[in-house]
């Protein structure tokens, strides 16, 4: 189960890397509001840092729930938080649009750079155009 969640996160990260564009340069899909994407992304970051793995899992859309569990989310985040330390504050944030090449599905992502006690973490929280949580990525920097 952990491997499936890691694959989902790796696929999401690959989408960013394969897009060939600067992450901050892509407009959100039509109908998506940057403020809403950021607000929802901040809620997920707060839940992740508060240890509410079940709530994060329950917000994932059905296809993402098939490859994740509260335990895989917990394991994923604890590994990163051990390196970065406790959350301190948000440093920078923006919303960007992306597209899954294989399916053509457009989605919006909240990108939040946050300071922690030891290191910073860049959070990417992806939402469908219906504002369903598609996936998360947390990269220690």
Regions found by a protein language model. Give the residues of each.
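Internal amphipathic alpha-helical segments of the cytochrome P450 catalytic fold
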Residues: 18, 53-54, 133
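Short, low-complexity N-terminal intrinsically disordered segments enriched in polar/charged residues
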Residues: 21-50
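Short solvent-exposed beta->alpha transition segments
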Residues: 54-105
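Exposed beta-sheet edge and beta->alpha loop/turn motif
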Residues: 94-141
């Amino acid at each position: 189960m952990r491997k499936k969640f890691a694959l989902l996160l790796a696929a999401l990260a690959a989408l960013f890397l394969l897009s060939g564009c600067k992450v901050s340069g892509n407009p959100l899909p039509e109908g998506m509001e940057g403020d809403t994407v950021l607000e929802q992304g901040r809620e997920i970051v707060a839940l992740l840092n508060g240890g509410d793995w079940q709530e994060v899992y329950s917000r994932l859309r059905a296809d993402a729930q098939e490859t994740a569990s509260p335990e895989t989310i917990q394991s994923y985040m604890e590994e990163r938080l051990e390196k970065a330390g406790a959350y301190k504050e948000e440093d920078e944030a923006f919303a960007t649009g992306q597209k899954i090449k294989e399916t053509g599905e457009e989605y919006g992502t909240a990108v939040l750079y946050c300071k922690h006690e030891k290191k910073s973490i860049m959070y990417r929280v992806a939402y469908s155009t219906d504002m369903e949580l598609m996936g998360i990525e947390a990269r220690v920097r």
